[in-house]
């Protein structure tokens, strides 16, 4: 087995029973691929597919003028280079975007020509605004902040059939309905009412009989009935009435008369029910007609108009009900044959026929007018307007788009469904197979008449009892709209606005000699894009607390947002877990609260297909043998197969073992024989999301707690020194690498140079492009603020001389340890009560944990100040501030900005700023004083940027931005100079490394080669030696050597050119950087200068901080106990954390207990390895012990491939504890945990005996730190990976004496942000009343709250030392009086 450079250092022992068939895919692929498809930058102009930007342009262009003589055509688009890179955009608060330019052609036709002739063509590039670019990690930088566009899970376009589940009508009758949902355009609904009449509505407007729509589509009554009904023909004669015998219609009917065969034998007696046997007898007897009673004709509907063949008189119209009068009329007129609609109560309802009777519209035009009146009430229906509206509703490509997905869904649901034999022979089968044959193939992205009729027919057939309704929560009916598609829709809507404006101007294009760029104003496009990225519900501020929260945010799918659901209307069904979520959407990870079930996370292996439906991978199974072939199946396809689970038992050849295998079929769990199985899951963790798959022993946790565990891992604050979890699941490395927090090598090579800011790698010759200088430089991110103010800091994980392969770890980031996700710390945990300090999930923690900075985290706050141009004059950033103490002034430089490295506390001035004050009338005394002392300071007021309350820290960076045309202060200039100096050094270092690398390659290439001549009189044909090269005055003289080998000479020339190019590039880059830094900054209107101060705040663990494990076991630190008081083990080691054992049973998250036991084994193994290393044992002994660890059970590791040095390095990395991986649903078994405990704590070891283990080695004797006595019972002790969450008490603690008051009520404001007071509510008042504390209550309700005069008086009394209270009238009482007066009731107050 090949281990990467980093994996060798710390191999994670996996308990997985099955080989990994499919690697975890790139976790951000959905976002990155979607946006790449939108931009199509890789494709040449003519190779671009009809997606993304290209599709948006194609859908709007060509734009034709109203008179038809001018049109604008789209040729292609290009994206320029962004002006600033990502860090610069973040610093300056601007959007990381590239300019979009479209090549547009204006074609003008000749008006005089008899046929369309092109008179003139004008073409040029038109600026279409800026398109935000995606960062390599799948986010966007909008106005300086990182944002994520969350994918949306919305209802797929197409046709859907459903019923109301009997909720509408009191009888519980099912009312069926259908809805045609386009991607863009009007919705068309069909619905049955309780009387079984069929109606339609457009865009949820007023309902109308469906026959109006059918008439509007061009059908008359007879044609409508012909489509939706089978016919019955009755033959009238003097002998009675006969009808054609259709065997299928007789079953279950009652014989109205005796049915006789030709000999007169009774086949079915009158009044008897006709059975299947009777039907066979009738068929065998060869009967073709049946006698019926004349009364049975009554109430039947005519299928067509009955016309007297002689006179041409219409005797009865289609759909007329047959009555006694009509029959008499037929008799008089000698009608011998009538055709009626075949209707029965069971499976051929009279719905359309009855609906037609309620519809009074006379024909096509009248029907269209009725629809017009419904859509545009109050507007006069002119013929042109009526036609235009009707055609635009469903048949115009401009206003209606079913989309590719919609068409596919529509066809599969209507035209391509499987019909039963009875349906094949009915009107429905004839309609689909004959009348509408081929309709599916010619269906475009607009509706056709056939589509509408087929939808109505399918709904009627449903009501007739044939077929199934759709499940709208099935993932085959919901699709994912990712970032590319969402942006395309916004771009298209912006272009549509442009189109309207352009059409107006196109008529003047020729006369005014306009060019395309004169016609197109790109403002609406950029406004639409800006609005979407800046304020759409799906454009969210990126959750950047730690790498996992970043990855999870980008993998989120939301059912909310424009075109989606709303929280209030979403019912239980939509939020619930559906069988089709399996392997596509995580059943565990979703928020608690109002969004539960509406916001989900993609499962680890899930991806979207071309149509936007989620699919998940399965291994193909053929004849009970599992193959290596992998197919991705969507929810619709999955329903057709029998699928085994990933943990099904296989033999060595991959055959399924056992008589029955647990499988899934159509969402149900079944037991199937191996030969029926068609697919098998690829991995046990396929069901869950990334966050849930990071929880070890997930299978032993209750789902509610697992949900909390998955959510709380995203809130873990990166610790100062990240520590890998001893018990993980094996997916930690994927998260760390894919989140781009840890840096991996782009190409293999040797590490040339390492410092805290940069890693330089000389690329291997075979990976470097020929003639190119192969050096990769990785600049690390240092102490950068994340969106949640946590610290992003990368640390090199390699040393000079290390040999790396592509994909090896180069640097660790926040919350990563050796390339693995490390959200918390491994803590020694004891489950026991301790003096009530772990009551209600409280956590008792050792002082040593805080002292060792195990949970210390650094938070970086950014504070801004702007100097504006005000009406009274410009604000000034200066050191000269009135009444500023010397201590504070000493921290500011001459420009008035705080020094880097200064330690600042609440209230300290960070940036001095003064604002001009309005001229006030001075008293004579003030005038005199001013005349004497020249006191001018009172003209300005101090508006400096001060450190906010409750915050203290160290200034780590200052940035100054100055508007173009305003002179920079010294500080701004020095920042620019130091930045340029650093950049120049960087470039010089790069050039030096490139040079060294190039000349090393040249030396290896030319030493030993023959030369035709060269510097220092090199003779022709002489061999080039190292000494000769060293003797040349400069290495650049090597290029003057003339080699005999022409290929080598060419390579030498290429390297020379490459170096020259690098030098020119470096100079060019320096000039660009200089220009960027020295040009003025783009600031908001009226802002002259802006200063940003970055402050690093160190937060130690303290009482009140929230902590949690990975199993939803959360709590608040109640006390930090001195280490000497903590419970300790027999060997004197104290535990780190004491948890309440009662927090486990009722919560049913037993995973934490198993984690603690396995963690305890990991720690014990680490201690044994540590002892062996201290005793300087031989590498062979270490190898033997590690073999027991890695190759006892579970997945086997190839330790023989490691050298002795690598074994020793591996062992030294395991000193603090072994690393275990217990994958979800395939984790360590109890026996394996026991095996590891026995390996860690062998019974023969005297040290182990001293600890006082129980038989299973899961509990030990602990001693009370205060008394030294042993606790009565043995205690479960072990190691758990414990996290500190982002709910820090430092950020919540707040106190106020006086502060701002509300304007109306004059009560103190609420909340820390407003520096508000504590709410003293109704229940608190009751408490004081209960105690009879009248005076306390009085001051609470008056002077401490809203008695304005009283609180001023109170202040005076305290200053004077008079401790008495003068309570007056609360202002809120005056508010109440005013409110009552506003109701027209006057209240007068009387004094007593």
Swiss-Prot record:
GO cellular component, as recorded: DNA-directed RNA polymerase complex
Domain of life: Bacteria
Pfam hit, one: RNA_pol_Rpb2_7
CDD domains: RNA_pol_B_RPB2
PROSITE patterns named among the record's database cross-references: RNA_POL_BETA
InterPro entries: DNA-dir_RNA_pol_bsu_ext_1_sf, DNA-dir_RNA_pol_bsu_external_1, DNA-dir_RNA_pol_su2, DNA-dir_RNAP_su2_dom, DNA-dir_RNAP_su2_hyb_sf, RNA_pol_bsu_bac, RNA_pol_bsu_CS, RNA_pol_bsu_protrusion
Catalytic activity reported: RNA(n) + a ribonucleoside 5'-triphosphate = RNA(n+1) + diphosphate
EC number: 2.7.7.6
SUPFAM superfamilies to which the protein is assigned, alphabetical: beta and beta-prime subunits of DNA dependent RNA-polymerase (SSF64484)
Assigned keywords, A-Z: DNA-directed RNA polymerase, Nucleotidyltransferase, Transcription, Transferase
One Gene Ontology MF term: ribonucleoside binding
GO biological process: DNA-templated transcription
Described function: DNA-dependent RNA polymerase catalyzes the transcription of DNA into RNA using the four ribonucleoside triphosphates as substrates.
Homology family: Belongs to the RNA polymerase beta chain family.
Subunit structure: The RNAP catalytic core consists of 2 alpha, 1 beta, 1 beta' and 1 omega subunit. When a sigma factor is associated with the core the holoenzyme is formed, which can initiate transcription.
PANTHER family reported for this sequence: DNA-DIRECTED RNA POLYMERASE I SUBUNIT 2
Protein name: DNA-directed RNA polymerase subunit beta
Natural source organism: Neisseria gonorrhoeae (strain NCCP11945)
Gene for this chain: rpoB
């Amino acid at each position: 087995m090949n281990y990467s450079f980093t994996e060798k250092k710390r191999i994670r022992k996996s308990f997985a029973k099955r080989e990994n068939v499919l690697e975890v895919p790139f976790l951000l692929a959905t976002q990155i691929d979607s946006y790449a498809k939108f931009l199509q930058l890789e494709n040449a102009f003519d190779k671009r597919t009809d997606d993304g930007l290209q599709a948006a342009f194609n859908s709007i262009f060509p734009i034709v003028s109203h008179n038809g003589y001018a049109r604008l055509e789209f040729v292609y688009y290009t994206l320029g280079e962004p002006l600033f890179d990502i860090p610069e955009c973040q610093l300056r608060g601007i959007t990381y975007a590239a300019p979009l330019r479209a090549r547009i052609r204006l074609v003008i036709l000749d008006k005089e020509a008899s046929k369309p002739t092109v008179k003139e063509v004008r073409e040029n590039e038109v600026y279409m605004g800026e398109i935000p670019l995606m960062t390599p990690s799948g986010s966007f930088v909008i106005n300086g902040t990182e944002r994520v566009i969350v994918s949306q899970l919305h209802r797929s376009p197409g046709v859907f059939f459903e019923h109301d589940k009997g909720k509408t009508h009191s009888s519980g009758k099912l009312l069926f309905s259908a809805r045609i949902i386009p991607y863009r355009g009007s919705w068309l609904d069909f619905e049955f009412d309780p009387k079984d009449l069929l109606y339609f509505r457009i865009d949820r407007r007023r309902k109308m009989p469906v026959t109006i729509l059918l008439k509007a589509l061009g059908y008359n009554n007879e044609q409508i009935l012909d489509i939706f009904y089978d016919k019955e023909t009755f033959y009238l004669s003097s002998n009675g009435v006969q009808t054609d015998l259709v065997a299928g219609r007789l079953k279950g009917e009652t014989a109205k008369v005796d049915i006789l065969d030709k000999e007169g034998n009774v086949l079915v007696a009158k009044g008897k029910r006709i059975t299947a046997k009777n039907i066979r007898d009738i068929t065998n007897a060869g009967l073709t007609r049946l006698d019926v009673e004349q009364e049975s004709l009554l109430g039947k509907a005519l299928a067509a108009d009955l016309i007297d063949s002689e006179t041409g008189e219409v005797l009865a119209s289609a759909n007329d009900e047959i009555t006694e009068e009509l029959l008499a009329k037929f008799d008089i007129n000698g009608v011998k044959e009538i055709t009626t609609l075949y209707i029965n109560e069971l499976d051929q309802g009279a719905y359309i026929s009855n609906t037609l009777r309620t519809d009074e519209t006379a024909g096509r035009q009248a029907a269209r007018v009725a629809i017009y009146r419904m859509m545009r009430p109050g507007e006069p229906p002119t013929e042109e307007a009526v036609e235009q509206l009707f055609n635009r509703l469903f048949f115009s490509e401009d206003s209606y788009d079913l989309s590719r997905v919609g068409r596919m869904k529509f066809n599969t649901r209507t035209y391509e469904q499987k019909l039963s034999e009875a349906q094949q022979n009915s009107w429905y089968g004839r309609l689909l197979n004959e009348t509408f044959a081929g309709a599916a193939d010619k269906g475009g992205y607009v509706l056709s008449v056939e589509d509408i009729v087929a939808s109505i027919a399918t709904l009627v057939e449903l009501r007739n009892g044939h077929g199934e309704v759709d499940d709208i929560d099935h993932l085959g009916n919901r699709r994912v709209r990712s970032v590319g598609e969402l942006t395309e829709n916004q771009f298209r809507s912006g272009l549509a606005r442009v189109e309207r404006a352009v059409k107006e101007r196109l008529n003047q294009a020729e006369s005014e000699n306009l060019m395309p760029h004169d016609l197109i104003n790109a403002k609406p496009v950029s406004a639409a894009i800006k609005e979407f990225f800046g304020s759409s519900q799906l454009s969210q501020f990126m959750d950047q607390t730690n790498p996992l929260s970043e990855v999870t945010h980008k993998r989120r799918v939301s059912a909310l947002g424009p075109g989606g659901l709303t929280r209030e209307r979403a019912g239980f069904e939509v939020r619930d877990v559906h069988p089709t979520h399996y392997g596509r959407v995580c059943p565990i990870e979703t928020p608690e609260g109002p969004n539960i079930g509406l916001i989900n996370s993609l499962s680890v292996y899930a991806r979207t297909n071309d149509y936007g439906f989620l699919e998940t991978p399965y291994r193909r199974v053929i004849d009970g043998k599992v193959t290596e072939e992998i197919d991705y199946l969507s929810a619709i396809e999955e329903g057709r197969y029998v699928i085994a689970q990933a943990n099904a038992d296989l033999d060595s050849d991959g055959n399924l073992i056992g008589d029955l295998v647990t499988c899934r079929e159509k969402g149900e769990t079944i037991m199937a024989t191996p030969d029926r199985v068609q697919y098998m899951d690829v991995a046990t963790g396929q069901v869950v999301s990334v966050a849930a798959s990071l929880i070890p022993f997930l299978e032993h946790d209750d789902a509610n707690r697992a949900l909390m565990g998955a959510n709380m891992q995203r809130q873990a604050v990166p610790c100062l020194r990240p520590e890998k979890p001893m018990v993980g699941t094996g997916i930690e490395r994927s998260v760390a690498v894919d989140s781009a927090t840890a840096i991996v090598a782009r190409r293999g090579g040797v590490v040339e140079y390492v410092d805290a800011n940069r890693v330089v790698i000389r690329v291997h010759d075979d990976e470097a492009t020929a003639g190119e200088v192969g050096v990769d430089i990785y600049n690390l991110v240092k102490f950068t603020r994340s969106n949640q103010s946590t610290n992003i800091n990368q640390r090199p994980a390699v040393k000079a001389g290390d040999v790396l392969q592509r994909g090896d770890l180069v640097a660790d980031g926040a919350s990563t340890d050796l390339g693995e996700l490390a959200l918390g710390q491994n803590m020694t945990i004891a489950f026991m009560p301790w003096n009530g300090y772990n009551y209600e999930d409280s956590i008792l923690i050792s002082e040593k944990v805080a002292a060792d900075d195990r949970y210390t985290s650094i938070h970086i706050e950014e504070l801004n100040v702007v100097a504006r141009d005000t009406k009274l004059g410009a604000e000034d950033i200066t050191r000269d501030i009135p009444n500023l103490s010397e201590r504070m002034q000493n921290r500011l430089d001459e420009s008035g900005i705080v020094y880097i490295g200064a330690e600042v506390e609440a209230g300290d001035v960070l940036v001095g700023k003064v604002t001009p004050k309005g001229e006030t009338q001075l008293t004579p005394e003030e005038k005199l004083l001013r005349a004497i002392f020249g006191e001018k300071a009172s003209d300005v007021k101090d508006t400096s940027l001060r450190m906010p309350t409750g915050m203290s820290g160290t200034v780590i960076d200052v940035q100054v931005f100055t508007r173009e045309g305003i002179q920079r202060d010294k500080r701004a200039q020095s920042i620019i100079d130091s930045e340029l100096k650093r950049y120049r050094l960087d470039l010089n270092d790069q050039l030096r490394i490139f040079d060294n690398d190039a000349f090393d390659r040249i030396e290896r290439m030319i030493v030993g080669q023959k030369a035709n001549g060269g510097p220092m009189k090199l003779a022709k044909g002489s061999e080039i030696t190292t000494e000769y090269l060293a003797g040349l005055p400069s290495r650049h003289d090597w290029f003057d050597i003339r080699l005999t080998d022409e290929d080598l000479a060419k390579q030498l020339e290429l390297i020379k050119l490459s170096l020259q190019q690098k030098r020119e590039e470096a100079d060019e880059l320096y000039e660009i950087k200089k220009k960027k830094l020295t040009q003025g900054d783009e600031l908001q209107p009226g802002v002259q200068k802006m200063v940003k101060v970055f402050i690093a705040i160190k937060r130690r663990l303290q009482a009140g901080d929230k902590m949690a494990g990975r199993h939803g076991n959360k709590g608040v630190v109640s006390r930090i106990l001195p280490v000497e008081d903590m419970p300790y083990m027999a060997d004197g080691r104290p535990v780190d954390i004491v948890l309440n054992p009662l927090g486990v049973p009722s919560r049913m998250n037993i995973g934490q207990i198993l984690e603690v036991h396995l963690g305890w084994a990991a720690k014990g193994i680490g201690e044994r390895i540590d002892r062996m290393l201290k005793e300087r044992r031989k590498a062979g002994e270490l190898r033997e012990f590690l073999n027991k660890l890695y190759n006892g059970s579970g997945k086997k590791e190839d330790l023989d491939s490691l050298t002795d040095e690598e074994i020793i390095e591996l062992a030294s990395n395991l000193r603090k504890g072994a690393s275990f991986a217990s994958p979800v649903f395939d984790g360590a078994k109890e026996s394996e945990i026991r095996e590891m405990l026995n390996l860690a704590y062998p019974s023969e070891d005297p040290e182990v005996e001293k600890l006082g283990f129980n038989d299973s080695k899961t509990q030990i004797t602990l001693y009370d730190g205060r008394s030294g006595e042993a606790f009565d019972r043995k205690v479960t002790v072990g190691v758990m990976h414990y996290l500190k969450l982002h709910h820090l008490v430092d950020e919540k603690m707040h106190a106020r004496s006086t502060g701002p008051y509300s304007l109306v009520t004059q009560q103190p404001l609420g909340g820390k942000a407003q520096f508000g007071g504590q709410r003293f509510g109704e229940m608190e008042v009751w408490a004081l009343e209960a105690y009879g504390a009248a005076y306390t209550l009085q001051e609470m309700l008056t002077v401490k709250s809203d008695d304005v005069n009283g609180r001023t008086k109170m202040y005076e009394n305290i200053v004077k030392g008079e401790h008495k209270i003068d309570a007056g009238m609360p202002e809120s009482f005056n508010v109440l009086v005013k409110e009552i007066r506003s109701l027209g009731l006057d209240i007068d107050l009387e004094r007593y």
